[in-house]
């Protein structure tokens, strides 16, 4: 963790090569989720000494077991919105800050049991895009900072 970014990347590559060459089981302990995601076949996410989830990197990312895992895995981290689930005209909606966000039909079975309840909804940064006011599923907000990364731009709001 004390290595500069470029050296950290080369060390990850070298350790991964060694793992492949040796063909043995290795346990690598890190607090850096990028290292875990890029080097691990299976990852054990711990919180205060308790196992939260053990899975492949992509399953941790796409199907986190709980809010802690969802917020820990991924960089930039997952965004969380709090709101109330409602059913209106046959559609499932979440009211967030005066805006109704419509859920796709594919999520109906997972969400239906939460109608009328306050929930915390997580959304990955790559599923958010800047849009125009009034567009469907648009939240109004102010951009605080933009970080230009070359191939992508990270927007904080």
List each language-model region with its residue ranges.
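Alpha-helix boundary/capping detector
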Residues: 29, 41, 86-87, 95
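Non-catalytic connector elements of ABC transporters
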Residues: 78-80, 87-157
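A generic "cationic amphipathic patch" detector
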Residues: 28, 49, 56, 62, ...
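C-terminal boundary and immediately downstream tail of ABC-type ATPase nucleotide-binding domains
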Residues: 63-88
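ABC ATPase nucleotide-binding domains
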Residues: 1-68, 72
